[in-house]
């Protein structure tokens, strides 16, 4: 699931280098063939394929393997658990890693956990994820309960 080239010591030459993700990405046709196989395996009609993204459980920008089958999955594009939000969370986490405010391991753990907690509880100005329980989503639920209480 992880790219062995990306370590805490190599982040300046890998994920923090502009253009890194594009440089290591497999050809588009190869990725689309994999997506088509996954859609078929799940019984999703090819006509509905545009509603789904080929997701990397650990995004390339956080040291995930660009092409390992164990790192690939499907996510809907839209919604609270959608790829659009996950991609934004990954970019925020990458910024924090590259600024030295989070370790690579912390960012990877956050994105493979309940990453939607990171998306909703993460501040653009702060890289503090210590209050976010990415394993259970507890902080996210507490915040939602407070906002709906009379």
Question: Whereabouts are the PLM-identified features?
Answer:
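Structured segments of extracytoplasmic/periplasmic soluble domains
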Residues: 37-45, 60-61, 75-82, 92, ...
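C-terminal, well-folded lobe of enzymatic/effector domains
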Residues: 9, 14, 84-150
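Short, well-ordered coil↔helix boundary/capping segments
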Residues: 66, 80-87
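Betabetaalpha-Me/HNH-type nuclease active-site subdomain
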Residues: 1-77
